[in-house]
From Swiss-Prot:
Family statement: Belongs to the glycosyl hydrolase 23 family.
Catalytic activity reported: Hydrolysis of (1->4)-beta-linkages between N-acetylmuramic acid and N-acetyl-D-glucosamine residues in a peptidoglycan and between N-acetyl-D-glucosamine residues in chitodextrins
Annotated organism of origin: Cyprinus carpio (Common carp)
GO cellular component: extracellular region
EC number: 3.2.1.17
Keywords assigned: Antimicrobial, Bacteriolytic enzyme, Glycosidase, Hydrolase
Entry's Gene Ontology BP terms: defense response to Gram-positive bacterium; killing of cells of another organism; peptidoglycan catabolic process
Protein name as annotated: Lysozyme g
UniProt GO MF annotations: lysozyme activity
Leading EC class: hydrolase
Annotated catalytic residues: E73
């Protein structure tokens, strides 16, 4: 299957920060931490695998990235109450922010995952316009960072995660995606 937004396995990553790793009381950081975090979410996320794969195929988006974002955003649904995060702004497995978008579908539905994937694709395209000299993989990672904090906060590739949650959002998601790929996503 051709994923038109870039090759996840070619995206550089520094992994997760110590703060992100501490979510699961991990004492490791870097590239190993996201693998452990994703592993902890795998059993919960397996029930969504067919849906993730279907949406990925339809949108030409790597399903491993969708799975990784579900892991990072909601821990495969574990942190949600009635589909919402504790502050009440993010909805669903992929945490569509109601302040910027009108969430559609049930929190764990194909409609929701499709909407969130389309939002990610829009960010990747905006990053490509803003940084026309970036490689496709750099734009992919930039789009992931923008999904977390907005396009205007992505100002350079070197500082791609400086304004993201945990100061590691795109690197963490990429490392989780690379791990999910090894699990058949």
């Amino acid at each position: 299957m051709a994923y038109i937004y870039g090759d996840t396995m070619k995206i550089d990553t520094t992994g997760a920060s110590e703060a992100t790793a501490k979510q699961d009381k991990l004492t490791i950081k870097g590239v190993e931490a996201p693998k452990k975090l994703a592993e902890h979410d795998l059993a919960r996320g397996e029930k969504y695998k067919n849906m993730i794969t279907k949406v990925g195929k339809a949108k030409k988006m790597d399903p491993a990235v969708i799975a990784a974002m579900i892991s990072r955003e909601s821990r495969a649904g574990a942190v949600l109450k009635n589909g919402w995060e504790p502050a009440g702004n993010g909805f669903g497995l992929m945490q569509v922010d109601k302040r910027s978008h009108t969430p559609v579908g049930a929190w764990d539905s194909e409609q929701h995952v499709t909407q969130a994937t389309e939002i990610l694709i829009g960010f990747i395209k905006e990053i490509k316009v803003n940084f026309p000299k970036w490689t496709q993989e750099q734009c992919f990672k930039g789009g992931i960072a923008a999904y977390n904090k907005g396009v205007s906060r992505v100002t350079s590739y070197e500082n791609i995660d400086v304004k993201t949650t945990g100061l590691d959002y795109s690197s963490d998601v990429v490392a989780r995606a690379q791990w999910f790929r090894s699990k058949g996503y």
